[in-house]
Amino acid sequence: MAETEEEEDSEAWLRLKPVEPLPSQCCGSGCSPCVFDLYYRDLERWETARARNDRSLLSGKQPPESQSCSAKLSPETFLAFHISTMEKVTKDTYLVRFTLPGNSRLGLRPGQHLILRGVVDGLEIQRAYTPISPVTAEGYFDVLIKCYRTGLMSQYVESWRTGDTAFWRGPFGSFLYEPKKYGELLMLAAGTGLAPMVPILQSITDDEDDETFVTLVGCFKTFEGIYLKTFFQEQARFWNVQTFFVLSQEVSPEQLPWSYRDKTHFGRLGQELVAELVACCRRKPFTLVCGSPAFNEDMARCLLSAGLTEDSYFLF
């Protein structure tokens, strides 16, 4: 009889043992804590509780689904947020607005990002996204999400409908913009790599005391693929902001509106153009880079060749 009770107790403990995450559950963005950090923390807690035969030591663990959006944003726990609107801004990209309770703020600083959790065919996946809404936005936050034909997270996002719930945790990010710290910022972004630049840029132009010069360069395939055109047109009206675009699949300025012809380069952003951008800055710029791993690597190499040092740029 005692042996049966011992076996049942052992099985009960095994059911409580944390499950090691799959590789797909790691977003690959170097977040801290990572899903694997959380797993090892919970595993250590479980091992201690089992050794002491004290299940109360597991009380710190809460399933992500148990937290509603009324709770405080946490890097460790996923919170539920409702989708209020979902706008298709290009053929493969959505601007999604999530509701915050009352007039509360999300609590991110410019440059920080969140982790989205999705489940497709029973497989859990996680990806990093940067909200593009102002950090002062009340009652909502906006996220720009590009969908890929074979992407698992893309399948999950394209299944969303207004009123659905999505789970986020955060904030994360080792770059935190500090007003007036840099005399000049050079922003190099490819595609949705614009996302972390948007709240940083807006925080500068919203602050009358922050006179940081900003040169933003957005890289896209076509003019139609440029995100947030209206926003960047408005930002370019500020005395301390310049915006440029690099289009890899356009060949003639005649196909562009007049307002874009003088600030658009055709081809790819390479060594020569990066050197020219750095040289045109009023002072040595601090450079922010965000795009694919290959884009980031190329830009780092170009910046070093242009005379910048490794401590004068940041790769998102």
UniProtKB/Swiss-Prot annotation:
<keyword id="KW-0274">FAD</keyword>
<dbReference type="InterPro" id="IPR008333">
    <property type="entry name" value="Cbr1-like_FAD-bd_dom"/>
</dbReference>
<comment type="function">
    <text>NADH-cytochrome b5 reductases are involved in desaturation and elongation of fatty acids, cholesterol biosynthesis, drug metabolism, and, in erythrocyte, methemoglobin reduction.</text>
</comment>
<protein>
    <recommendedName>
        <fullName>NADH-cytochrome b5 reductase-like</fullName>
        <ecNumber>1.6.2.2</ecNumber>
    </recommendedName>
</protein>
<dbReference type="GO" id="GO:0005654">
    <property type="term" value="C:nucleoplasm"/>
</dbReference>
<dbReference type="Pfam" id="PF00175">
    <property type="entry name" value="NAD_binding_1"/>
</dbReference>
<feature type="domain" description="Oxidoreductase-like">
    <location>
        <begin position="17"/>
        <end position="53"/>
    </location>
</feature>
<feature type="domain" description="FAD-binding FR-type">
    <location>
        <begin position="76"/>
        <end position="178"/>
    </location>
</feature>
<keyword id="KW-0520">NAD</keyword>
<dbReference type="InterPro" id="IPR001433">
    <property type="entry name" value="OxRdtase_FAD/NAD-bd"/>
</dbReference>
<dbReference type="InterPro" id="IPR017927">
    <property type="entry name" value="FAD-bd_FR_type"/>
</dbReference>
<dbReference type="Pfam" id="PF09791">
    <property type="entry name" value="Oxidored-like"/>
</dbReference>
<dbReference type="InterPro" id="IPR039261">
    <property type="entry name" value="FNR_nucleotide-bd"/>
</dbReference>
<dbReference type="GO" id="GO:0004128">
    <property type="term" value="F:cytochrome-b5 reductase activity, acting on NAD(P)H"/>
</dbReference>
<keyword id="KW-0285">Flavoprotein</keyword>
<feature type="binding site">
    <location>
        <begin position="158"/>
        <end position="173"/>
    </location>
    <ligand>
        <name>FAD</name>
    </ligand>
</feature>
<feature type="binding site">
    <location>
        <begin position="183"/>
        <end position="215"/>
    </location>
    <ligand>
        <name>FAD</name>
    </ligand>
</feature>
<dbReference type="InterPro" id="IPR001709">
    <property type="entry name" value="Flavoprot_Pyr_Nucl_cyt_Rdtase"/>
</dbReference>
<dbReference type="InterPro" id="IPR001834">
    <property type="entry name" value="CBR-like"/>
</dbReference>
<dbReference type="Pfam" id="PF00970">
    <property type="entry name" value="FAD_binding_6"/>
</dbReference>
<dbReference type="InterPro" id="IPR017938">
    <property type="entry name" value="Riboflavin_synthase-like_b-brl"/>
</dbReference>
<keyword id="KW-0560">Oxidoreductase</keyword>
<comment type="similarity">
    <text>Belongs to the flavoprotein pyridine nucleotide cytochrome reductase family.</text>
</comment>
<dbReference type="InterPro" id="IPR019180">
    <property type="entry name" value="Oxidoreductase-like_N"/>
</dbReference>
<dbReference type="GO" id="GO:0005789">
    <property type="term" value="C:endoplasmic reticulum membrane"/>
</dbReference>
